UniProtKB/Swiss-Prot annotation:
<dbReference type="GO" id="GO:0016328">
    <property type="term" value="C:lateral plasma membrane"/>
</dbReference>
<keyword id="KW-1017">Isopeptide bond</keyword>
<keyword id="KW-0597">Phosphoprotein</keyword>
<keyword id="KW-0449">Lipoprotein</keyword>
<dbReference type="InterPro" id="IPR006689">
    <property type="entry name" value="Small_GTPase_ARF/SAR"/>
</dbReference>
<protein>
    <recommendedName>
        <fullName>ADP-ribosylation factor-like protein 2</fullName>
    </recommendedName>
</protein>
<feature type="binding site">
    <location>
        <begin position="23"/>
        <end position="30"/>
    </location>
    <ligand>
        <name>GTP</name>
    </ligand>
</feature>
<dbReference type="GO" id="GO:0015630">
    <property type="term" value="C:microtubule cytoskeleton"/>
</dbReference>
<feature type="binding site">
    <location>
        <begin position="66"/>
        <end position="70"/>
    </location>
    <ligand>
        <name>GTP</name>
    </ligand>
</feature>
<keyword id="KW-0206">Cytoskeleton</keyword>
<comment type="function">
    <text>Small GTP-binding protein which cycles between an inactive GDP-bound and an active GTP-bound form, and the rate of cycling is regulated by guanine nucleotide exchange factors (GEF) and GTPase-activating proteins (GAP). GTP-binding protein that does not act as an allosteric activator of the cholera toxin catalytic subunit. Regulates formation of new microtubules and centrosome integrity. Prevents the TBCD-induced microtubule destruction. Participates in association with TBCD, in the disassembly of the apical junction complexes.</text>
</comment>
<keyword id="KW-0963">Cytoplasm</keyword>
<dbReference type="GO" id="GO:0070830">
    <property type="term" value="P:bicellular tight junction assembly"/>
</dbReference>
<dbReference type="InterPro" id="IPR045873">
    <property type="entry name" value="Arl2"/>
</dbReference>
<dbReference type="GO" id="GO:0051457">
    <property type="term" value="P:maintenance of protein location in nucleus"/>
</dbReference>
<comment type="subunit">
    <text>Found in a complex with ARL2, ARL2BP and SLC25A6. Found in a complex with at least ARL2, PPP2CB, PPP2R1A, PPP2R2A, PPP2R5E and TBCD. Interacts with ELMOD2. The GTP-bound form interacts with ARL2BP. The GDP-bound form interacts preferentially with TBCD. Interacts with UNC119. Found in a complex with ARL2, ARL2BP and SLC25A4. The GTP-bound form interacts with PDE6D.</text>
</comment>
<dbReference type="InterPro" id="IPR044612">
    <property type="entry name" value="ARL2/3"/>
</dbReference>
């Protein structure tokens, strides 16, 4: 029995999943986390550092790391990569000006060895705002079709209303579960 098999079996018992939520500043990462946890989202301030929430969902114990996206904090993102099962990349669909910056940052994450194998969920947030780019437009702008190193999906959503957060999280958990948790 190899080390990987032993680790998978240990994780199977706990059904622990580590999710890392990243994206540019003001994309809505903290709002998504709070909404998913049933917390009030009326007063959200920029994350200077990180938030960690541990939640139960569908029999999984989710450890969600929400890391600030300001330019000055991005160099610290690599400190959170270890043992990540799923990467949630949050995009502000209404911020057309920073789509290229968003694409560049995402592509730099996808070549990180410590994120190899992590499932990628892209939340195209703020779909409720006028002028928000469609998922197809974001998929093209971020060059998602070129991603071969990770299983990925783009999911339109609104963190403020909570619309379509669950389908994204459920897909992410299904994909991680099929890779990490083996049947005995």
């Amino acid at each position: 029995m190899g080390l990987l098999t032993i680790l998978k079996k240990m994780k199977q018992k706990e059904r622990d999943v580590r999710l890392l939520m990243l994206g540019l500043d003001n994309a809505g990462k903290t709002t998504i986390l709070k909404k998913f946890n049933g917390e009030d989202v009326d007063t959200i301030s920029p994350t200077l550092g990180f938030n960690i929430k541990t939640l139960e969902h569908r029999g999984f114990k989710l450890n969600i790391w929400d890391v600030g996206g300001q330019k000055s904090l991005r160099s610290y993102w690599r400190n959170y990569f270890e043992s990540t099962d799923g990467l949630i990349w949050v995009v502000d669909s209404a911020d057309r000006q920073r789509m290229q910056d968003c694409q560049r940052e995402l592509q730099s994450l996808l070549v990180e060895e410590r994120l190899a194998g992590a499932t990628l969920l892209i939340f195209a947030n703020k779909q409720d705002l006028p002028g928000a780019l469609s998922c197809n437009a974001i998929q093209e702008a971020l060059e998602l079709d070129s991603i071969r190193s990770h299983h990925w999906r783009i999911q339109g959503c609104s963190a403020v209303t909570g619309e379509d957060l669950l389908p994204g999280i459920d897909w992410l958990l299904d994909d991680i579960s099929s890779r990490v948790f083996t049947a005995d």
